Amino acid sequence: MKKVSINGNDLTLEEMIMVAREYCSITIEPEAMVRVANTRKVVERYVEEERVVYGITTGFGKFSDVAISKDQTEMLQRNLIISHACGVGEPLKEEVVRGVLLLRANALAKGYSGVRPNTLETLINMLNKGVHPIIPEKGSLGSSGDLAPLAHMVLVMMGEGEATYKGNKMSGKEAMEKAGIPPVVLSAKEGLALINGTQVMTAIGALLIYDCQKLIKLADIAGALTLEAQRGIIDAFDHKVHRVRPHQGQQQTAQNIVNLVAGSTLITRQGEVRVQDAYTLRCIPQIHGASRDAIMYAVDKVNIEINGATDNPLIFPEEDEVISGGNFHGQPMALTFDFLGIAIAELANVSERRIERLVNPQLSGLPAFLTAKGGLNSGFMITQYAAASLVSENKILAHPASVDSIPSSANQEDHVSMGTIAARKARSIYENTVNVLGVELMAASQAVEFYDGYELGIGTRRAYDTIRKSVAHLDEDRVMYVDMNRCAELVFNHKIVDEVEKVVSIL
C-alpha cells in the first residue's frame, strides 16, 4: 500500500483522503525530524535555565502569570490534558479521527512546536497501527484551537482515555498495549503543543471540502437532467453570455451544462417552446457557479491550514526565540466553513425549487406529481415535502457560527472562533443537500420518461442509466424512502459523477 510522506509543508487534500479514508500509512521525512529535534533542544534549554515562557514554565490561559518550576513541568503537562478533556456528544467518525491524527502530526513536523521526536513518532504509530482515540464531537470553542477534543486524543497517547482498535472499543491503555505502542509521559511544552491547534475543525472541514468538489459537479448533472425534463432553453448557457461576466464558476457551470446535454432532443432554443425559462433553470450558471467559486475558495484556505503551524507559543530555533502569538485561533477556518455551508445550502435551495417545477403540472406540463394515475397514487408528492423540510433545516444551519463569540478563561481568551461548530454545521448541510439532489435526480429521471422518442444528452444519459440501475421507474406507489436512500447513496459515494465523467469532462 502506498505511504504518504509528511514534512509539514506540502500535504495535499488528496493525500489526506488517502490516509483518512483509504487507511494509507504515513512516514515523516528525515529532514523534518531533524527540525523537530533541533527545536526540542531550545525547549529543554529554556526549562533548564528556568526562563519565563508561556506554557513551558507558566500556567495556561488566565494562569499564564503563575510560574512553574522545572521539576513540575511534567505534572503541568499531564494536568493540562486530563483537565482539558471535557468533550461531550457522539464520537467523531473514524475518518475524521484519522484526519486529526494526520494533521496534528503534520503540524508538529514543521518543527516549531518543541515536542520530542519520540512523541511525534507515537502519534504516527497510532495512526499507522489503527489506534483511533474516541473524540467527542462537541466542546471546542475553536480558540485556543480545539483544546477539548484534542485532549481526548492525547489521553490515549498517555495510555488513558478510550479508543477503538481493529473495530473494537476499549480503554486507551489496552489499545496501546494491543498495538505495541508504549504510552508517552509528556515532557515540557508537549501537552500544549499537542492540543493547541485547529486540527479537529480542519479535519472535519477538509473531508467535507473534498466531497463538495464532487457535489458541485453532481448539482450540474441534476440541473442538466431537469433542464431536459422541462424542455429547457440552451441559449442561456451560451459562452457569449458568460464571458461578459467572467466569474470562473459561472463560466465552468455553463460549459458543463452544454457538455452534459450535448445531443439531447429534449433541449430547445429560445422561442421554440417559450421565450425564456424560470430562474432556477436559466440561472443555473450564476447560482451553481457562485457556490462553485465558494467551494474553490474553501479549498485554497484549507490547503494552507493543513500545512500550517497552529501552536502557541511558537519556537524559532535559528533565531533562538519563543514567541507567543495567536496561530491557534480558528477564525480563518470558521469564516471559511460558514461560507462553505451557505454555498452548499444554496445548491439545495435551487434544487428543491426545480423539484417543485417537475412535480407541479401547472409548471411542467407533465402529469401531477409525475404519476400517470394521480389520485389513486400520490407519486412524487411527498418527496418534495421531504426536500422542502431539508432545505428549511439548512436555512437554520446556515446561520454563521463565527459571529457568536463568547469570552472564556476569565476574559483572557475574549474572542473565540466557533470554527468546529461551523465545520460540523457545514457537514450537516452537506448531508441534507445530498438527499435533496437525490430527490431531484429521481424526479427528473421519472419526468423525462413521459416524452416519446426522446434522446438524452451524452452526460445526462449516463447519469440516467446509473440511476435506473438502482431505482426503477415509478408506475404505482411504493415505499419511497427506499428509492430515496438508494439515490442518495449514489450521490454520497460519487457514483453518478464518476460514471458521467467517463463520457463527459466536467469542470
From Swiss-Prot:
Record note on modification: Contains an active site 4-methylidene-imidazol-5-one (MIO), which is formed autocatalytically by cyclization and dehydration of residues Ser-Ser-Gly.
Main location group: cytoplasm
Entry's Gene Ontology cellular component terms: cytoplasm
Subcellular localization: Cytoplasm
Metabolic or biological pathway, per its Swiss-Prot or TrEMBL entry: Amino-acid degradation; L-histidine degradation into L-glutamate; N-formimidoyl-L-glutamate from L-histidine: step 1/3
Protein name: Histidine ammonia-lyase
Enzyme class: lyase
UniProt cross-references to CDD domains, sorted A to Z: PAL-HAL
Family under the similarity heading: Belongs to the PAL/histidase family.
Keyword tags: Cytoplasm, Histidine metabolism, Lyase
Cross-link 5-imidazolinone (Ser-Gly) per UniProt, renumbered positions: 143-145
SUPFAM superfamilies, A to Z: L-aspartase-like
Any one GO MF annotation of this record: histidine ammonia-lyase activity
Residue(s) carrying 2,3-didehydroalanine (Ser): 144
One GO biological process term: L-histidine catabolic process to glutamate and formate
Entry EC no(s): 4.3.1.3
InterPro entries: Aromatic_Lyase (IPR001106), Fumarase/histidase_N (IPR024083), HutH (IPR005921), L-Aspartase-like (IPR008948), Phe/His_NH3-lyase_AS (IPR022313)
Organism: Alkaliphilus metalliredigens (strain QYMF)
The reaction(s) this protein catalyses: L-histidine = trans-urocanate + NH4(+)
Pfam families, per the entry: Lyase_aromatic
